[in-house]
């Protein structure tokens, strides 16, 4: 176990933005929420899943919808409290820990804010190691874990619970509900035991995000005998696939998501 403070949040947000490759949107608003929660409620305990008992209940917390809309609406502490209370009432069990569902954008930050507000630890694991666009696109689906019952809440206090026939239908119905709620909701899905998280989760993703963020911040201080690119690859164990120049970026926003594309004439 270790503590996550404000400087750690800065690095995690930066590294998660890299891992997300644009998925999950800009982590900026989520970073502000996480920093605000830590300032008010104290640092968050980051734990490994092996520190939990097999039957402990772990709850992912995420935002569904367009991150740019979340920037306008924000997320208050009441949403986290009501959501987790509803999960506990439904399952009749005490919630042991929070976890992120993806690495990237806002959803790398909201679990930190939730854990701080709720006084719960956060598990160093997620369901993809990146940021994919749909709810069913996680390792937990591959492992046969159900995303439902999914629970969600908007900033007005509207709450919903759905049970579906498969994880793709969670995505379909949630998007419709998200649109009706103004374009973004806070949700929890894939409520699992620690045993399931241990078997199917992508472990160490928060730590990895922090390491990448630290490498990016320190890239200007690389040794004289290395280029910034060489330093970053050496630090992270990465490698270059190709090199090119971005010539065009197109961003599109709908009520339930934001998408985009980047154009590169040809690799260099």
Predicted regions and their residues:
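N-terminal phosphate-binding or glycine-rich loops at protein starts, especially the Walker A/P-loop
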Residues: 1-37
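Short glycine/serine/threonine-rich phosphate/pyrophosphate-binding segments
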Residues: 26-31, 80-81, 101-113, 129-134
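A structural-propensity feature for long, helix-poor, extended segments
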Residues: 52-68, 137-177
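Glycine-rich oxoanion-binding loops at beta->alpha junctions
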Residues: 52-96
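A short, small-residue-rich loop immediately preceding and capping a beta-strand
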Residues: 93-107, 121-125
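Short, acidic/small-residue loops that bind anionic groups at enzyme active sites
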Residues: 117-136
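Phosphate/diphosphate-binding glycine-rich loops and adjacent basic-rich segments that engage nucleotide
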Residues: 150-219
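Conserved small/polar residues in nucleotide/adenosyl-binding loops
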Residues: 260-265
